[in-house]
Regions:
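N-terminal catalytic or cofactor-binding beta/alpha core of small enzyme domains
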Residues: 2-181, 186-255, 261-303
């Protein structure tokens, strides 16, 4: 599935049910002739189409460290297995689809935010809706941003992504009575704990401690990954953020699960290039996608 980039804001239809908003997102529906499943995968952080008004002062190669690079390539087989697939084209460093639109870092504003600010651990770290910092303490901008600048990003990028994902989920609930949403991310090979570098597992699944999806779905995905030989953690160190919190309502048949994959399995983090492990991981992800679709179809078929 080819990467698509552009700067126009006009909608372009690809094939029936598919949508391309240049520079913003691409939506893929199940391939023709494939049994559809009540499943949607989304990749909000793999975009690399940097807008012309992104007035950053750090080099592009530094900004790219914020990307979940190639995650969209890992999950591009979803439509062929019967699932919907949505990916952002804009970069996470420009505006983060996995943050609430009021999750604002007030330190980077030239004027007060017009609504109550949602203060979170991430926003206080400079990693809110609009990133202030990259690589720990490196400032992305050399000036404060205006409310108008941020609102333009929200209206042109953040809200369209949410609207498209919501429509995909709603359509499946209307058809099947339930939907299984998989929010796809990648994580650094190591994390920090008490000042020490700690190797991370192959996968981390997040369901916000059982609040965003039925624990049985989380356990199913964890078991499938372990069967393939991968190490898996659940809700540690990532339990999921805004997207699965917003859309995961398991009591209403709306199940949202976040999946983080260790970048060391498939890419060189310094060069931001795929390595020889990409193919093997892609085959595992394809198998996982098929098993998730079969799981979901089995759930809606139960009396």
């Amino acid at each position: 599935m080819a990467r698509i980039a552009g700067t126009e804001l006009a909608q372009v239809n690809l094939t029936q049910g598919n949508t391309h908003l240049p520079g913003i997102l691409v939506r893929y529906e199940p391939a023709q002739g494939v049994q559809p499943a009540p499943v949607v995968f989304d990749s909000p952080h793999s975009g690399y189409d940097y807008p012309g008004d992104f007035d950053h002062v750090v080099p592009r190669e530094v900004l790219r460290r914020a990307e979940d690079a190639f995650v969209d390539d890992l999950y591009e087989g979803a439509p062929g297995a019967g699932a919907g697939f949505l990916k952002a084209l804009f970069p996470r460093a420009y505006i983060d689809p996995n943050r609430h639109e009021d999750e604002i870092d007030s330190d980077m504003l030239s004027e007060p935010w017009p609504r109550p600010v949602r203060v979170t651990e991430k926003s206080e770290m400079g990693l809110g809706l609009i990133r202030r910092l990259i690589k720990g303490r490196v400032h992305i901008y050399d000036r404060p941003l205006t409310v108008g600048e941020i609102m333009a990003r929200i209206e042109s990028y953040h809200r369209p992504y949410y609207a498209e994902l919501e429509s995909m989920l709603d359509a499946r609930v209307a058809t099947y009575g339930a939907v299984w949403h998989v929010n796809c991310h990648s994580m650094r090979t190591t994390g920090r704990q008490q000042g020490k570098s700690i190797p991370r597992d192959d996968f981390v699944l997040g369901d916000r401690e059982g609040e965003s999806c039925d624990p049985g779905f989380t356990e199913f995905v964890a078991a499938r990954l372990k069967d393939m030989g991968y190490s898996v953690q659940i809700n540690h160190p990532f339990k999921g953020a805004e997207l699965i919190e917003r859309f995961g309502r398991p009591l209403e048949g709306r199940h949202s699960l976040q999946i983080e994959v260790n970048r060391g399995l498939y890419m060189d983090e310094d060069r931001i290039e795929k390595h020889d492990g990409f193919g093997e991981l892609k085959r595992s992800i394809d198998r996982l996608i098929a098993e998730i679709c079969a799981f979901a179809n089995g759930q809606i078929a139960r009396p």
